[in-house]
Amino acid sequence: MKKVALLDYGSGNLRSAQRALERVGAEVEVTNDPDVVLAADGLLVPGVGAFDACMKGLKAVQGDRMIGQRLAGGRPVMGICVGMQIMFDSGNEHGISAAGCGQWPGNVEKLEARVLPHMGWNTVEAAQDSQLFAGLDADTRFYFVHSYGVRWWEFEGDGLTRAPLVTWAQHESDRFVAAVENGALMATQFHPEKSGDAGAQLLRNWIDLL
């Protein structure tokens, strides 16, 4: 049974994520203990709320350093919702700019849709060769609830680095990043733990990669 550390930094629906992971066969510990986080097979970083507040909470438990240490060693990390957003360079919400973890270039900004938050079920354009979306049909829907996102992707591969796999979604005129697969670091803007059977399959796919 794979062991997953669910990072407790004062943000995110921890119990919902814990139950979802346990249902697909993971052994889960809710923790911010560095020893437990670094030893786990996988680290899941949830996130609900404002970008700046989440980053402050993350730094208060040295979560940003733990994420960096795991990734430096090629150890799997997955972010959900704001847990995905904070992996980018920066975020700007309510006029407050904050630095993120800097794992990916890009800025989290408010969507331009008339109806916000983008809340409910939506399809995604899964990246070719995606491992997270393996076994899921193109018309599969996932549960979103957010008003901010990343609308521009600036990380292209070259001869030395492989470009991450980027999955997109559309809400009104906004096209935004719905998921990223970048070696050991993966993340989703939607909530797999609230996405029924489809979300369970995606989490199972991630667990199988650990």
Swiss-Prot record:
Where is this protein found? Cytoplasm
The protein's organism comes out as Corynebacterium diphtheriae (strain ATCC 700971 / NCTC 13129 / Biotype gravis)
Gene that this sequence comes from: hisH
Q: Where are the transmembrane segments?
A: none
What is the organism lineage in this UniProt record?
A: Bacteria, Bacillati, Actinomycetota, Actinomycetes, Mycobacteriales
What reaction gets catalysed by this protein? 5-[(5-phospho-1-deoxy-D-ribulos-1-ylimino)methylamino]-1-(5-phospho-beta-D-ribosyl)imidazole-4-carboxamide + L-glutamine = D-erythro-1-(imidazol-4-yl)glycerol 3-phosphate + 5-amino-1-(5-phospho-beta-D-ribosyl)imidazole-4-carboxamide + L-glutamate + H(+); L-glutamine + H2O = L-glutamate + NH4(+)
Q: Which PANTHER family match?
A: IMIDAZOLE GLYCEROL PHOSPHATE SYNTHASE SUBUNIT HISH (PTHR42701:SF1)
**What pathway is it annotated to?**
Amino-acid biosynthesis; L-histidine biosynthesis; L-histidine from 5-phospho-alpha-D-ribose 1-diphosphate: step 5/9
Q: What protein am I looking at? A: Imidazole glycerol phosphate synthase subunit HisH
Give the Enzyme Commission number.
4.3.2.10, 3.5.1.2
Active-site residues, as the UniProt record annotates them: C81 (nucleophile), H191, E193
